[in-house]
Amino acid sequence: MRCYNPIDGNSIPKPFRVHPGTEVTQDLVNKFIQKHQINKRRYNYLMDMYDNRTDVFNLPDKEKYKPDNRLSIGYARYITDTFVGYFNGIPIHKQHEEETVNELIQLFDDDNDIEDEESELARLACIYGHSFEIMYQDDDSKTHVCYVDPTECFIVYDTTKEMNPVFAVHYVEDDEMKVFGTVYTETEMIDINGNVGGVTFGERETNIYDGIPVIEFILNDSRTGIFESVVSLINAMNKATSEKANDVDYFADAYLAITGMEVTEEDARKIRDNRIINAYGPDGAKIEIKFLDKPDSDATQEHLLDRLHKMIFQISMVADISDENFGATSGVALEHKYQAMNNLAHAFDRKFQSALRQRYKLLFSLTVNMPQHSADAYQQIEYTFKRNMPIDYLAQAQAATTTANLTSTETALKILDIVQDVPAELKRIEEEREKSAKSFDREGGFFNDSELKDEDHANATQSKCASDTKSGE
């Protein structure tokens, strides 16, 4: 059986913390690597749940003569992927009021395939409760980021209310249990190597960023995975489903009882092979032949399975979009079905945005990316999170039309999911207005094609006459 007990609340690790001003030494790093190794038991368990390697496969074997089905339903993956698709199925939009800043953001995002990067960060955060991103420079001095799961990385914070990061460690173990990695501090990056029992510091280089280039993306303050609260329910569901399958096998292997006569092995063989019973007892004895009935607990089992299924989605707060009644729902009723998951997504929005601000702060801190006087431009970046769900465009259009009479056009356009970039849309609207204005005549009417041609012909004639007059002179 596994070491991690998901039901035990004490098994959920707390963030690593040290007093402010603590010196980062080899001993300190080794101490926290040892603590992190303990946390990896939980991480491995959660990834096993996501990959559908659940506890039902670790239950004791039954006797050989009993059916022993092991069925596991992929609830953890379904819950995670459904929520990530809802939260980040539509990529996060970033917008700044200055076009030069927008161009830098777009270039950085394109170079790093940021849509996939952020999707993986969200997925890992939903599985483990948090994930990490490391920023680095390539050989051409271009800034890059890569996601890292928490089995290979951790951050140590100070004990202040602000929880400022003191140092971060990224390390990997090879097949020979040797450890290689890097320690990141405010001022330097230190290579480490050794083994889990102890690592030593190697080469050092200056940290060129304005802060530790390791960013933590958290799902919630407790850093619990999105399906972690229903682990016990998932295990119970798998066990109940497996027992249900065992019962089906039991009924398929029902016993045939023959009373009132003696049945030899040869008789039993003929009954089995010929599927015919011609029985008579001595001296007119009463013979009874029937299958033994087993207790039927089907209704009880189905009630348990139905209850567990509903509780898994209710407690995880993720909508069961595979429900038959879900597809027939629309409008306000559909929004109510998404309400719990929407609340969860909004809470994740705030955590995710905080990490994104830290990412672009580090990006803008390098003069190779942004002039020093504009290093604070990251503070004005506007992040737009949109939910990936069925859209009623007619209702949105009506709401936007009504809102436009009360607010600015920009505010009204934000209601429309079909508009991905509001400032760009406003620019296109203005261009169309200018183009339309040019097609009006001085009295406010439109030129028709013949009028435009006549006007062009008249202008050409006047030009020719003026030219001829000048030549005659």
Show the residue positions of the predicted features:
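Extended, helix-rich architectural segments
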Residues: 1-144, 465-473
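Charged, alpha-helix-enriched surfaces in structured cytosolic catalytic cores
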Residues: 113-116, 303, 307, 407
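Structured loops at beta-to-helix junctions and adjacent beta-edge loops in soluble globular domains
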Residues: 136, 170-172, 240, 292-295, ...
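Extended, charged amphipathic alpha-helical segments
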Residues: 200-336
